[in-house]
């Protein structure tokens, strides 16, 4: 699948098949996150891949809107070392991971992290140093169903020269 098709067909998936994802595929997806743009190329990220069902359940239970993480094959926690642009850098890495998952025929869903009260709890659970901040939790797996939700048409969001 080419990059444009991947971006135009990506969607948030919250229901997954009970099917594992190959380690090589996961590593390729994370490698795409690693290659994201970052301010002054600082690359402040660390990626924690969680396949263990019991740990995924703990993560799902801590979140307020991520219960489906428990049924996904994988949860990727994206953390960035605290700095001026940690949120932008980590968000770029997260989007690369979402697109890479789609390119591999997988579904994914970005669960917010940075502004959530559970962010420090998640960092402790996964053993991160105190100077790392949770950017996102990403559920990844084989989607239980296909289809795309409606999106706003381009004419509603594109403006030339001014609003």
Predicted segment positions?
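Acidic, surface-exposed loops and disordered segments
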Residues: 1-163
């Amino acid at each position: 699948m080419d990059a444009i098709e991947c971006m135009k067909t990506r969607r948030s998936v919250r229901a997954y098949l009970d099917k594992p994802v190959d380690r090589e595929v996961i590593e390729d997806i994370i490698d795409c996150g690693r290659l994201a743009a970052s301010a002054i190329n600082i690359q402040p990220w660390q990626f924690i891949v969680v396949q263990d069902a019991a740990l995924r359940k703990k993560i799902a239970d801590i979140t307020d809107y991520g219960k489906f993480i428990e049924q996904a094959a994988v949860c990727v926690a994206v953390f960035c070392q605290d700095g001026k642009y940690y949120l932008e850098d980590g968000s770029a890495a997260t989007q690369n991971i979402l697109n890479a998952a789609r390119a591999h025929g997988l579904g994914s869903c970005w669960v917010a992290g940075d502004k959530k009260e559970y962010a420090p709890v998640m960092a402790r659970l996964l053993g991160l140093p105190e100077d790392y901040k949770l950017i996102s939790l990403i559920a990844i797996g084989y989607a239980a169903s296909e289809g795309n939700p409606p999106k706003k048409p381009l004419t509603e969001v594109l403006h030339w020269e001014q609003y």
